[in-house]
Amino acid sequence: MKKLFLGALLLVFAGVMAACGSNNGAESGKKEIVVAATKTPHAEILKEAEPLLKEKGYTLKVKVLSDYKMYNKALADKEVDANYFQHIPYLEQEMKENTDYKLVNAGAVHLEPFGIYSKTYKSLKDLPDGATIILTNNVAEQGRMLAMLENAGLITLDSKVETVDATLKDIKKNPKNLEFKKVAPELTAKAYENKEGDAVFINVNYAIQNKLNPKKDAIEVESTKNNPYANIIAVRKGEEDSAKIKALMEVLHSKKIKDFIEKKYDGAVLPVSE
């Protein structure tokens, strides 16, 4: 009787262990990539990448957050595997402000040329003296916006400062006495619709969400030549060569994704493979 009881007990124990082993195997075999991304165009591009990643054995989960400042924090706090919303100058600025962030660029995916929009004027040269220019309060973006104004001959920046690092305080000449107003990036399209400024800088993602195409609607579009503002996949330092991140980048640099970007955004968003 004792032998029968002991045998039954061993069988139950073996069954429990087998079940545990099976669960652990399923968990360890789970191949999921979690990416925090802004809605347009980033999350849309990732959605197109989802079936391609599935072919490689990965499930893609995309998290759209409500504030730019949340994306790198979520990545640093290991809430996500990667984020997709920023360019390198912005990432570098974020890490200057948050020294505990140890994040790196895993690769560029696309470029969003900045556009300047106006309800009143057809070109930057038409802006009158004292015109109000609305730009974003994102310090890492100011250099690229000011470069557009300098290229149009409206201002002169301090030659000792790298353009990518320039801010409003680096304006040395402003012959038209342009006035500058800073607003959050997500409010620029609204400022344009409400005619709050004579000219308004709008990030492409917010332009697209508000049915604006920089190629067709902007009075000036940022040059893509030697442009350092390509949007990247950012990851934690040391994870850029992990299998899941390599798979993600391979898919995002694939011809199918390149063709999708070119067709869907009609020049407002340009694919990059580097």
Swiss-Prot record:
**Lipid anchor positions (S-diacylglycerol cysteine):** 20
Give the top-rank taxon of the lineage listed in the UniProt record for this protein.
Bacteria
**Major place of residence:** membrane
Signal peptide residues on this chain, from the entry's feature table: 1-19
- A Gene Ontology biological process annotation? amino acid transport
Q: Does the keyword Coiled coil apply?
A: no
Q: What InterPro entries does this protein's entry cite?
A: Lipoprotein_NlpA
Q: What induces it?
A: Repressed by methionine via the S-box system.
Transport is among the record's keywords:
yes
Where are the N-palmitoyl cysteine lipid anchors?
A: 20
Keywords (A to Z) from UniProt: Amino-acid transport, Cell membrane, Lipoprotein, Membrane, Palmitate, Signal, Transport
Please report the record's description of how this protein sits within the membrane. Answer: Lipid-anchor
Location in or out of the cell: Cell membrane
How does the record describe its quaternary structure?
The complex is composed of two ATP-binding proteins (MetN), two transmembrane proteins (MetP) and a solute-binding protein (metQ).
Record function comment: Part of the ABC transporter complex MetNPQ involved in methionine import. Binds the methionine and transfers it to the membrane-bound permease. It has also been shown to be involved in methionine sulfoxide transport.
Protein name per Swiss-Prot or TrEMBL: Methionine-binding lipoprotein MetQ
State the organism named in the record: Bacillus subtilis (strain 168)
